[in-house]
Swiss-Prot record:
Localization of this protein: Cytoplasm, Cytoskeleton, Microtubule organizing center, Centrosome
Keywords assigned: Cell cycle, Cell division, Cytoplasm, Cytoskeleton, Leucine-rich repeat, Mitosis, Repeat, Ubl conjugation pathway
Domain F-box residues, every copy: 111-157
Name of the protein described by the UniProt record: F-box/LRR-repeat protein 7
Gene: Fbxl7
Known function: Substrate recognition component of a SCF (SKP1-CUL1-F-box protein) E3 ubiquitin-protein ligase complex. During mitosis, it mediates the ubiquitination and subsequent proteasomal degradation of AURKA, causing mitotic arrest. It also regulates mitochondrial function by mediating the ubiquitination and proteasomal degradation of the apoptosis inhibitor BIRC5.
LRR repeat ranges per the UniProt record: 185-210, 211-236, 237-262, 271-296, 297-322, 323-348, 349-374, 375-400, 401-426, 427-452
PROSITE patterns assigned to the protein according to its UniProt record, in alphabetical order: FBOX (PS50181)
Region listing for Disordered, in residue ranges: 1-79
InterPro entries reported for this sequence: F-box-like_dom_sf, F-box_dom, Leu-rich_rpt, Leu-rich_rpt_Cys-con_subtyp, LRR_dom_sf
Length: 491
């Protein structure tokens, strides 16, 4: 994606080049002038063209002899009627210093259907386009150029692609968007550059400097960014609420910069306004880093720490001390989290609605009892692969968390039909149930669930020894249920 502000982007010039060379590998997004130099090749560097909005070029039919006006624009504005055409004739065999030029009128072309739409409809259509496509639309004609840069379309920037020079694209874009408000881009609220591996600290620093109203930033999979860049963003964007740094392996902490902490900005105080934080696969994150994050991000409500393999129960203790408003928490695949960690999580009490502890092998019925006792409003629990959980833990969970809607206890070999019976008799609102690879489950347990949980929408019994009759029973009683199974006789 890209945008330009009317000048060439050479070295560190004040203007900006075609962003399309960075975003969509295309040419300048502003309608270009007809080339005056007849010796200029069509293969010249397209990314260095001027970005000013010209009047529609005079187009010569390619069949006319002596046509040497370079590349004529084939995308002249359809709103122009009775267009004048410059017809250049070859000079006669005499010594004439100038070619003879005569003007002729081209027959009026029928207006394209899309050009009949009013501006507000065009802006609405453009609002559904990704950023790089929007930049390409800006190249069609003058009207589209003006519409494509409507401020309402630039509340979000979304860049994708591993080969994009994201740092440069962000610099050019923010510069173009700052034309009406020098040095700041007040309309931009969301930046999504997930999977752009060429993003570095320089690109994030550009965002931090130019986007004070930023509310959402997603840089998942951008593994070249570091703590310092994240510090800049959270320090200079006081309204930031949503931050996704999943897969950013160099990020080990989130805090204010030293300068921001010293100045005690009235916008910040000492706190960061982030409510949603995803640090999945930040495998270098340790307890001390989580301590710092919790101390600065006290307003967190959604926190995802999947596969942060160095975290322990101590880190969860810090988290609960500072972040008392957490509603959703995932510590799945954190192998050092045990029942003691769940005891700390249980202190969130009825505020906790979503908990994922999948593949935390040290968790047993003891930890489940802590959560079930104090987190009575729990709606979602993923305990897949917690092999220490038995029917006793499931029974205690079912009796205390009666509003449970989604439960995953797959690969828990000690859970049997007894646990399913407790679920069926207490959790009538259950909609999703995964029992994948639960070796002790039989068709009898499934029938009890189906007879009581009529709203069941998804049932996973892959690699379970259940009969076709039991699966058909489930289908009859739970009409909307999608059954995932490995029984070839059932279809």
């Amino acid at each position: 994606m890209g945008a330009n502000n009317g000048k060439q982007y050479g070295s560190e010039g004040k203007g900006s080049s075609s962003v399309s060379s960075d975003v969509s590998s295309s040419t300048d997004h502003t309608p270009t002038k007809a080339q005056r130099n007849v010796a200029t090749s069509e293969d010249s560097d397209l990314s260095m063209r001027t970005l000013s909005t010209p009047s529609p070029a005079l187009i010569c039919p390619p069949t006319l002899p002596g046509f040497q006006n370079g590349r004529g624009s084939s995308t002249s504005s359809s709103s122009i009627t009775g267009e004048t055409v410059a017809m250049v004739h070859s000079p006669p065999p005499t010594r004439l210093t100038h070619p003879l030029i005569r003007l002729a009128s081209r027959p009026q072309k029928e207006q394209a259907s899309i050009d009949r739409l009013p501006d507000h409809s065009m802006v609405q259509i453009f609002s559904f386009l990704p950023t790089n496509q929007l930049c390409r639309c800006a190249r069609v004609c003058r009207r589209w150029y003006n519409l494509a840069w409507d401020p309402r379309l630039w509340r979000t920037i979304r860049l994708t692609g591993e080969t994009i020079n994201v740092d440069r694209a962000l610099k050019v874009l923010t510069r173009r968007l700052c034309q009406d408000t020098p040095n700041v881009c007040l309309m931009l609220e969301t930046v999504i550059v997930s999977g752009c591996r060429r993003l570095t600290d320089r690109g994030l620093y550009t965002i931090a400097q130019c986007c004070p109203e930023l509310r959402r930033l997603e840089v998942s999979g951008c593994y070249n960014i570091s703590n310092e860049a994240v510090f800049d963003v959270v320090s200079l964007c006081p309204n930031l609420e949503h931050l996704d740094v999943s897969g950013c392996s160099k990020v080990t902490c989130i805090s204010l910069t030293r300068e921001a902490s010293i100045k005690l900005s009235p916008l910040h105080g000492k706190q960061i306004s982030i409510r949603y934080l995803d640090m999945t696969d930040c495998f270098v994150l340790e307890d001390e880093g989580l301590h710092t994050i919790a101390a600065h991000c006290t307003q967190l409500t959604h926190l995802y720490l999947r596969r942060c393999v160095r975290l322990t129960d101590e880190g969860l203790r810090y988290l609960v001390i500072y972040c008392t408003s957490i509603k959703e928490l995932s510590v799945s695949d954190c192998r050092f989290v045990s029942d003691f960690g769940l005891r700390e999580i249980a202190k969130l009490e009825s505020r906790l609605r979503y908990l994922s502890i999948a593949h935390c092998g040290r968790i047993t019925d003891v930890g489940i009892r802590y959560v079930a006792k104090y987190c009575s409003k729990l709606r979602y629990l993923n305990a897949r692969g917690c092999e220490g959980i038995t029917d006793h833990g499931v029974e205690y969970l079912a009796k205390n968390c009666t509003k449970l809607k989604s439960l995953d206890i797959g690969k828990c070999p000690l859970v049997s039909d007894t646990g399913l019976e407790s679920l069926a008799l207490n959790c009538f609102n259950l909609k999703r149930l995964s029992l994948k690879s639960c070796e002790s489950i039989t068709g009898q347990g499934l029938q009890i669930v189906a007879a009581n949980c009529f709203d069941l929408q998804m049932l996973n019994v892959q690699d379970c020894e259940v009969s076709v009759e039991a699966l058909r029973f489930v289908k009859r009683h739970c009409k909307r249920c999608v059954i995932e199974h490995t029984n070839p006789a059932f279809f």
